[in-house]
Design a protein with these regions (language model features):
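Acidic low-complexity segments
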Residues: 2-47, 52, 63, 119-120
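Short coil/turn connectors at secondary-structure junctions
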Residues: 5-7, 34-35, 40-42, 64-67, ...
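Internal alpha/beta scaffold segment
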Residues: 17, 28, 34, 85-129
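Short acidic, glycine/serine/threonine-rich loops at helix termini
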Residues: 21-24, 50-51, 56-58, 80-84, ...
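Structured alpha-helical segments in the cores of large, soluble enzyme domains
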Residues: 62, 66-70, 88-102, 183-191
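Gly-rich Lys/Arg/Thr-decorated short loops/hinges at beta-loop-alpha junctions or inter-strand turns
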Residues: 71-83
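Hydrophobic alpha-helical positions that pack around
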Residues: 108-205
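A short, hydrophobic C-terminal helix/tail in secreted or cell-surface proteins
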Residues: 206-210
Length: 210
């Protein structure tokens, strides 16, 4: 914006279009530190907007104090549907990612929080966690800002946190749907974070009429 000159990188296409090969250690052989290192090396950050490094969030001072891993599937902002589509199309991948995170916190339970205007997504995810004693789906009232971190923690656990507290202070860790899926990709496939499901809106006169 200031018009300053900065260094730039020019990437030239070699025209070969080779598919990148990712490598990951077998998950069952990974230690906690190796899982966190895989998340860090893949560059996984919160995909809900803040961009906070996920490996830092998943390494609190006292892991045993974490009681809830909350997956934010509320997506309360108007028109946004990226996480909704993930829950609809690949709910099993979301659950797989959540189980990886839960393995880091043996005493914690997982809660996948979804607003009640997404009944079909709730049904899809609920079907995937059927019989899993550690994971539940919380159907939340549709309202703004239901997906805000503090609001979500209160809605799912009844725990209120003030502005000076972090979610970990209330025994909670919150990540959104896309972030949890990215964790799975990083840990089990060695895939770095270079893509994200997004919502595309088409504004035309015809669309406005409809």
């Amino acid at each position: 914006p200031a018009g300053a000159k900065v260094n730039a990188i020019v990437i030239e296409n070699d025209g070969e279009f080779k598919e990148a090969e990712f490598q990951a250690k077998p998950y069952q052989d990974m230690t906690r530190d190796e899982v966190l290192a895989a998340i860090k090396d893949a560059g996984i950050v919160g995909l809900g907007g803040a961009g906070f490094p996920t490996h830092v969030k998943l390494a609190p001072k006292d892991p045993d104090a974490i009681e809830y891993i909350i997956v934010n599937g509320a997506e309360c902002e108007p028109y946004i549907t990226g996480d909704y589509r993930i829950m609809m199309e690949t709910p099993e991948v979301l659950v797989e990612g959540l189980n990886i995170v839960l393995d880091l916190f043996p005493k914690a339970k997982g809660i996948i929080a979804v607003e009640d205007n997404k009944k079909d997504a709730i049904a899809k995810v609920s079907d995937c966690v059927k019989g899993d004693a550690r994971i539940s789906v919380a159907e939340l009232k549709t309202k703004y800002p239901q997906g805000a971190e503090r609001s979500l923690i209160y809605a799912t656990t009844g725990r209120a946190i003030n502005s000076s507290m972090l979610p970990a202070d209330a025994g909670c860790i919150v990540d959104n749907v896309a972030t949890i899926v990215a964790v799975k990709d990083a840990v089990k496939e060695g895939k770095p974070l270079f893509q994200r499901v997004v919502t595309c809106l088409l504004y035309t006169s015809d669309a406005a009429d409809e």
